[in-house]
Amino acid sequence: MGLDSEIFSILNVVRIFIVATVAFFVTLLITPAWTKVLHKYKLGKQIRTDTAFKSLHTEGGPIAAKLHQAKEGTPTMGGVVMWATVVIITIGFWLLANFFDGFWSTMNFFSRAQTWLPLGVMIFAALLGALDDYMGILRVGPKGGGLRMSHRMLLYILAGVVGAWWFFFKLGFNSINIPFMGDFIIGWWYIPFFIFTIVATAFSANETDGLDGLAAGIFLTMFGAYAVIAFDQGRMDLVVFLSAIMGSLVAFLWFNIYPARFFMGDTGSMSLGVTLGVVAMLTNTPFLLIPIGIIFIIESGSVIVQLTSKK
């Protein structure tokens, strides 16, 4: 039994390494082509005026917001290369496993219990973010373009409702873990708690994009932390899925560190933020989001203070 367990662990480490490596190189390959598209169609960053960036021309705004001003016009929607890579790899290995046995069957990590929902919400949030980005580029919408904050929040809530339904009714989740205290069954309260976690994570993540390597670097650290947690829990398909995200993020950072060629945009930050929230709930460690995502919390807290103080 010990030998079988050791072989199983080694096999999963190999899966993680292979998927992360493939994700890294796929992102490296498609990024130059996508960058050309961004430049050709002038899909550049516009500074928002409906969030903390409203304070760019006033004293005392968040440091990140002040730095954003110099970045206006830098191509955005770079996050497409990340989530597209994850989708391609996940579906690609799943298709190969359906046509071939042996090695390819082992590499498949597309499972109902661990990766269906994270991938599904990633795609949903990515498309929502892409719409928001494009509206901002065209300056369609209120205060500089993009979706209204209220509309984005409603869509976050929708994603949270779908996720809560899946977790509660399909996967049987009804408890939360509080560090050092254990699991607590909360019954139907699990649904609003799930929705709150998704909305809070998505909102916080969405406020940090736009500085060279900042959002991608933070996401890489956070997904890495949750990969360790998932590995410890034996959720190997989820770990492999997270390794695909991390491999793509490393490649994204290759292009995104100073001077950044592009930013991930809302299509990147929204998709990764919502996915992170789902992963936290899937591993039943939502309260660990607080120490793991402290930078997101600080920046989003600064945003909220700015908005409420101006009102």
Feature names for model-found ranges:
Residues M1-F263, T267-G301:
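"…together with the soluble PPM/PP2C metallo-phosphatase catalytic core" -> "…together
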Residues L289, T308-K311:
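Short beta-alpha connecting loops at secondary-structure transitions
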Residues S300-T308:
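Predominantly late transmembrane helices and immediately cytosolic-facing juxtamembrane segments
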